[in-house]
Amino acid sequence: MKLSIILGAGLAAAAIMLAQPLPPDDASQKKIIADATAKALAYVNDLPDFVCRQVTRRNEDPKGTNQWKTMDTVNEQLTLLNRKEEYRTLSVNGKKASGENRPGGLLRSSDFANYLSWIFDPKAKAEISWSQWDALRGHRVHVLGFRVKPENSQFVISKGKGQPVTAGIFGVVSVDSESGSILKVGIIATDVPASFPVQGSAIEANYEFAKIGDHYFVVPLKADLHSKEGKMLVWTEVEYHDYRKPGAETASK
């Protein structure tokens, strides 16, 4: 009985190892990184005109005990025309809004392009390396690790009217193995001065294929932004829904 269990466990482990592809060779890894860089730098130009909904939830945990309270929920319509964003506020905390005044401090879809620039812009001088294979929302992905020094970074953290700081960053990028498209970036701030009020800042941005008109495009899917000030934790969730061509009816309201 014990022997059969051991053999079964061994066969299962062998099956997992066989299912996991070997790491790409050095030349292939360099090409994966080069192709991901090209995709990142072309991201804005590859976006079509579209309309979608952006939903933002801002949450706080004053004591850092994982007891979150949603401070507000903002539902907006986002229109992208000729690479220019236009927001119309639909509701705030479930109450219909006039649509004219956008609440301050909200993420913009263009920030998804900024995150890619922070890593792949040549001025960032990022150290990028292939890390491992992984799976993400049904895609087999390459996971790349990266690091950008503060002197080359575009990640600026501000607090109130005080002097902002430019932080270094490190993290991971998930790249679709079939298309080379970037599907997720995870960014963590480093080298923040000990005297600065915000001592923790991290971003996770997800991208996905969406059908807009007759074609599929890589567009923002969701983002989570985290920060820490003393015991206070702040978590902003952003989701995108109902992508369509301008002038087309939404599939869900």
Q: Predicted regions: what is each one?
A:
Residues 10-20:
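Hydrophobic h-region of N-terminal signal peptides that target proteins for export
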